[in-house]
């Protein structure tokens, strides 16, 4: 089985703060799957480290619809970079033949179900990140849109 996975979950130091989000449960998937790492934010041209960013005015679906933006904490609009990264992740997923995707929780790119609310206050709201929304939007059928949660590593 081929699985596209957020690179930070594999220990790649590509988080906004220059760190990683290494997750042993995700890493163990390599025993039964071919893991294909991707960092949509770096693929979109953003540096590491970079200022924190959140979706302002909605969620990933709203960004795809042009109704919300991804902004950094210092007020820079990075929406285009997030869109570019999402489309890159989609291309990697499709061209690799991946059947599953494991993405970083709460990220403005990869969040699934919960993202930060755009106020930079640490408050969560329901919604998906831009990459997650892009992948779900292009999913061939509703049965493929199953969400599962993996325990987060601290």
Map each language-model feature to its residues.
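Glycine-rich anion/phosphate-binding loops
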Residues: 77-91
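Extreme N-terminal starter segment of soluble prokaryotic enzymes
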Residues: 1-3
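Short, well-ordered beta-to-alpha junction loops that form the rim of enzyme active sites
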Residues: 8, 104-108
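Conserved small/polar residues in nucleotide/adenosyl-binding loops
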Residues: 137-144
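Short Gly/Thr/Asp-enriched flexible loops that form oxyanion-binding sites at enzyme active sites
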Residues: 110-129
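Short N-terminal binding/cap micro-motifs at the start of the first secondary-structure element
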Residues: 11-18
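Short, surface-exposed acidic-centric catalytic microdomains
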Residues: 21-70
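Hydrophobic alpha-helical segments, chiefly the membrane-spanning helices
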Residues: 149-154
């Amino acid at each position: 089985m081929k699985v596209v996975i957020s690179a930070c979950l594999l220990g790649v130091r590509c988080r906004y703060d220059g760190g990683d989000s290494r997750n042993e449960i995700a890493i163990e998937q390599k025993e039964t799957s071919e893991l294909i790492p991707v960092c949509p934010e770096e693929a979109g041209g953003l540096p590491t480290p970079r200022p924190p960013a959140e979706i302002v005015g909605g969620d990933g679906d709203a960004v795809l619809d042009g109704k919300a933006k991804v902004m950094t904490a210092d007020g820079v609009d990075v929406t285009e970079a997030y869109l570019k990264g999402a489309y890159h992740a989609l291309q990697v997923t499709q061209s690799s033949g991946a059947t599953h995707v494991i993405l970083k929780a709460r990220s403005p790119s990869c969040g699934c179900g919960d993202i930060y609310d755009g106020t930079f206050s640490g408050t969560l709201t329901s919604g998906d990140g831009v990459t997650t929304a892009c992948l779900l939007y292009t999913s061939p059928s509703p049965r493929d849109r199953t969400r599962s949660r993996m325990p987060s590593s601290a």
